[in-house]
Design a protein with these regions (language model features):
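Class I S-adenosyl-L-methionine-dependent methyltransferase catalytic core
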Residues: 1-175
Length: 175
């Protein structure tokens, strides 16, 4: 039986991640691990991972799996673009789960006291991206307009250095 959801996503919490956002992080992800994508949405991240030879499966609140109440068995690490309205709660929960993770989050998150308080408790790494990610927005779709803010990969147990620089190359056609 699926757990009941406690959070109703806001209209801007359903932004889909284009495949190219994973290009910089993929070389650092362990192919021997089973990856869990807990905010799967339309499945862009999980699909991109599988297309690149990773074992990855996803769950989502829209299909009845509330990340804050549900934790599947058999996964080694998590990768997701969490709903930004819940970014601090999401970070707290993933730290509590005690496994490696990669979260695609706004760069400004690292400057917030709440995030810093959580991050002081674990070893973590960040991947700064040279360009902004143009997310597929729930209302506008992918209209080619520039992203509103820069994002980074916030990780624990993934990257070889505390700070890594990643290169985004925009494709001619995005997911």
């Amino acid at each position: 039986m699926k757990p009941k959801r406690q959070y109703k996503p806001g209209p801007m919490d359903n932004c889909q991640t284009p495949a190219y956002a994973l290009d910089p992080i993929l070389p650092y992800l362990n192919r021997d691990w089973t990856w869990w994508e807990p905010a799967e949405g339309k499945g862009n991240i999980a699909t991109t991972m599988r297309q690149n030879g990773y074992t990855c499966w996803g769950t989502d609140i829209e299909t009845g799996y509330d990340y804050f109440d549900y934790c599947p068995s058999g996964w080694d690490a998590s990768i997701t673009n969490p709903p930004y309205g819940l970014k601090f709660q999401w970070l707290k929960r993933i730290i509590e789960l005690g496994k490696p993770f990669a979260l695609l989050v706004p760069v400004e998150m690292i400057g917030a006291k709440t995030a810093q308080d959580f991050l002081k408790t674990i070893p973590f790494e960040i991947m700064l991206l040279n360009r902004r990610v143009n997310f597929v927005m729930p209302i506008k779709g992918l209209n080619g307009a520039g992203a509103q803010f820069p994002v980074m990969w916030l990780c624990s147990g993934i990257l070889p250095e505390k700070i890594v620089f990643g290169e985004i190359n925009y494709p001619k056609k995005q997911l």
